Amino acid sequence: RQRHPDCDKPPDTKRCTGHNPAFYYNPRRKNCERFSYGGCGGNGNHFKTKQLCHCHCHEND
């Protein structure tokens, strides 16, 4: 599976509709980490679950 093109972008933490728990891929740590997604806009580097984040962004060494 090809990696999501936004996996290397920083998480968008600006507030919009609230605090939505989500996960983003941290390319420096090569791991999915929790953050608070503001609910609108941003980029594709936000996922509802850690499993989805890992599936779309994990790098196979």
Curated annotation (Swiss-Prot):
Q: State the Gene3D superfamilies in the record.
A: Pancreatic trypsin inhibitor Kunitz domain (4.10.410.10)
Going by the entry's taxonomy, the superkingdom of the source organism is recorded as Eukaryota
Q: Which residues form the BPTI/Kunitz inhibitor domain?
A: 7-57
The set of disulfide-linked cysteines is C7-C57, C16-C40, C32-C53
Enumerate the SMART domains for this protein. KU
Give the record's GO CC terms: extracellular space
Alphabetic keyword roster? Disulfide bond, Ion channel impairing toxin, Neurotoxin, Potassium channel impairing toxin, Presynaptic neurotoxin, Secreted, Toxin, Voltage-gated potassium channel impairing toxin
Cited InterPro entries: Kunitz_BPTI, Kunitz_BPTI_sf, Prtase_inh_Kunz-CS, TFPI/VKTCI-like
Q: What does the subunit comment say?
A: Heterodimer; disulfide-linked. The A chains have phospholipase A2 activity and the B chains show homology with the basic protease inhibitors.
Its function, per the record, reads:
Beta-bungarotoxins are presynaptic neurotoxins of the venom. The B chain is homologous to venom basic protease inhibitors but has no protease inhibitor activity and blocks voltage-gated potassium channels (Kv).
Q: Which family does it belong to?
A: Belongs to the venom Kunitz-type family.
> Which protein are we looking at?
Kunitz-type serine protease inhibitor homolog beta-bungarotoxin B5-B chain
